[in-house]
Amino acid sequence: MTQFTDIDKLAVSTIRILAVDTVSKANSGHPGAPLGMAPAAHVLWSQMRMNPTNPDWINRDRFVLSNGHAVALLYSMLHLTGYDLSIEDLKQFRQLGSRTPGHPEFELPGVEVTTGPLGQGISNAVGMAMAQANLAATYNKPGFTLSDNYTYVFLGDGCLQEGISSEASSLAGHLKLGNLIAIYDDNKITIDGATSISFDEDVAKRYEAYGWEVLYVENGNEDLAGIAKAIAQAKLSKDKPTLIKMTTTIGYGSLHAGSHSVHGAPLKADDVKQLKSKFGFNPDKSFVVPQEVYDHYQKTILKPGVEANNKWNKLFSEYQKKFPELGAELARRLSGQLPANWESKLPTYTAKDSAVATRKLSETVLEDVYNQLPELIGGSADLTPSNLTRWKEALDFQPPSSGSGNYSGRYIRYGIREHAMGAIMNGISAFGANYKPYGGTFLNFVSYAAGAVRLSALSGHPVIWVATHDSIGVGEDGPTHQPIETLAHFRSLPNIQVWRPADGNEVSAAYKNSLESKHTPSIIALSRQNLPQLEGSSIESASKGGYVLQDVANPDIILVATGSEVSLSVEAAKTLAAKNIKARVVSLPDFFTFDKQPLEYRLSVLPDNVPIMSVEVLATTCWGKYAHQSFGIDRFGASGKAPEVFKFFGFTPEGVAERAQKTIAFYKGDKLISPLKKAF
């Protein structure tokens, strides 16, 4: 067991004062949790295996700050332990353009995931632990332990109150993730006051019921040995994740310690002075780090981390010689590259092929590419038979003791936990090794996971949502299951691909773009009902996000559509042709990708001087960027047989043609410019 001395106490005091100075300089932030959690941070980081000079080393221990408001603690630790974060960076905390934003963001070396919305971090940590278990089961060999890292997470009462933490923690217990250790900052304070006003459940019993090991540290403010003992004991648990319930005092050392007033506001000047005096620091100086503290962390963290990384590099070099195929595969994954020519396995179709639901075409893609992509790992939120997300030879990701799979399996049974699924996918992606996680549910229920989807986009995790039952085509299940506003919501997010493919070639294009994406997540919205294969579609064209599917010379109108309404627009164009009205049909499967194309190309698809009408059985919000007139559904759906529901809302060839004629008449004589053209 580690023996703690005066240098450890000085290091803890330094962390506390540095975090307080960081918040005070910004005159904004959260000093309370860092003051209470500093001892745990010091002890944990002194035991974690990491290399600050190579923060992306694949076998490093991961640290997730789920209570992201305590980020001054994380920034202090990154600075003290040798990461690329200077005192000047700390002084710029929460300032525009700084490297130290108000909550942890994934881009900073040493920050594993973006946190802040409570409950996301613990769920990300579950994903990281799952990824590690899969990597180890896939590549470890006797004498060659390439992957054995732990994932550690700090979380607070707020995280535990969020429903997502229950979803993720329940799954972690089921999966017996012994590589996951969570330290619960039990300070009994929330923003409104004591937790007793709204939160008095027995957290320990709750986590025991989930299948976790639960350990206790009664004095997290000072008991370094007790914290170290709990972490060491947690690492002995190989078939259960561990929750260390650590009692702390929020704002420890402050005049307002133990109260909610110290949670989210800088300490007053007199409080800072007495705090510094109490911990042996000059009350008139700020951002002071004793050299012996730097030296201590250099000795206990930086030097051992570099040595461990070098040792791993030698081991991997030997591994590549003994297991050349696996070694080359892992090296490729660590470089962030997909296998050469993997896309040649994507299925292609002609208009003579039979009509098939795009969810079924998605299943075909997964079936065709899974052997090519060992980094592909996915599942469904208890909708596998509906989402069609499991390839025939898939092995479930399950604890070996379950008898129904093992950790080398790449199909995840998420249960009915959409929000956790989204955050877990973020964690799997953030782990590294080029993991490509996907998760299936109904499109309408991706909304349950909106918080996780937003963080995917903000962080640049290229996760994939396989979102089936994408419209009123759901039919009898009715408006509770029929998405209306869902795509408009997610299309409004920055940095996300939202695909709604119309046929097999477009489904393949959606997967191609999504799997090749480095920093952008994707939602692939798929139909329940059969759709025809289209004349004029191709993977190459659809990969641009939008293209001319069927053209005529000098069109009177352009019909631009997505998904099931593309084939409907083709039929409407025939109806119009019978009336001597010429219509171009444009398919626009993904706005985001189309917007990335050169303006010249986009204007060739949606040009000036022709009225453009969008056709989509969803909310018309967002279509103003591409169409002069929109035909959609801006009310909730209806229960009934799908063809009857389409007819009820006017989505028939005749209904589309009628509205196209009205659009032509409305804009007749006007000098139209493309909606793509804007002043700025």
From Swiss-Prot:
The active site is at residue 418. It comes from the Eukaryota. This is Transketolase 1. It comes from Saccharomyces cerevisiae (strain ATCC 204508 / S288c). NCBIfam families: tktlase_bact. The record marks 30, 263 as: Important for catalytic activity. GO terms for molecular function: metal ion binding; transketolase activity. Changing residue 103 to F: Loss of activity. SUPFAM superfamilies: Thiamin diphosphate-binding fold (THDP-binding) (SSF52518), TK C-terminal domain-like (SSF52922). Its EC number is 2.2.1.1. Homodimer. Catalyzes the transfer of a two-carbon ketol group from a ketose donor to an aldose acceptor, via a covalent intermediate with the cofactor thiamine pyrophosphate. Gene3D superfamilies: 3.40.50.920, 3.40.50.970. Changing residue 469 to A: Strongly reduced affinity for xylulose 5-phosphate and ribose 5-phosphate. It is an enzyme of class 2 (transferase). Mg(2+) binds at residues 157, 187, 189. The gene is TKL1.
